[in-house]
Design a protein with these regions (language model features):
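C-terminal and inter-domain tail/linker signature
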Residues: 1-142
């Protein structure tokens, strides 16, 4: 029986670290020369340190961020997809957007490519229009 960590286990550890807001644990899961891209923004983060720093900024804006993982789908030993719903509320100004506790609920899919037991590349797919609408037009009912 192999003691190697599976792609599904790495994905599960990643989302546990996200939900614990543990940026150091996230950085440890990524290879030093890795990349992460939020496809909706198109600006990649390069390297585990930059990925961790970007996530830290996200947690400043959304300190209550929580991911509800619906599925972890493993294609093979080096590729896995995670479907999730992210729920959070904006608590700090994000560029021109002032924080008024606007709630967001975003469904997304993150595709992870692994190499040697580390995340080499992650691509996160979610709808930017939904995100922007929720930040701009949220009401207390949402």
């Amino acid at each position: 029986m192999s003691t190697a960590v599976t792609a599904r286990e790495i994905a599960s550890e990643l989302y546990q670290a996200y939900n614990s807001h543990d940026t150091a644990a996230v950085a440890q899961l990524y290879a030093e020369d890795s990349s992460h891209v939020d496809v909706a923004h198109g600006h990649p983060k390069l390297g585990s340190s930059e990925i961790s720093e970007g996530l830290g900024k996200f947690f400043q804006w959304f300190p209550d961020a929580a991911w509800d993982v619906a599925q972890i789908i493993s294609a093979d030993s080096d590729h896995v997809a995670v479907t999730y719903t992210l729920k959070a509320s904006l608590q700090a100004a994000m560029g021109p957007v002032e924080a008024h506790g606007q709630k967001i609920s975003l469904r997304g899919v993150q595709v992870l490519t692994l190499r040697d037991g580390k995340i080499q590349r992650s691509e996160d797919y979610w709808d930017a229009a939904t995100f922007q609408k929720q930040l701009s037009f949220n009401t207390k009912e949402i």
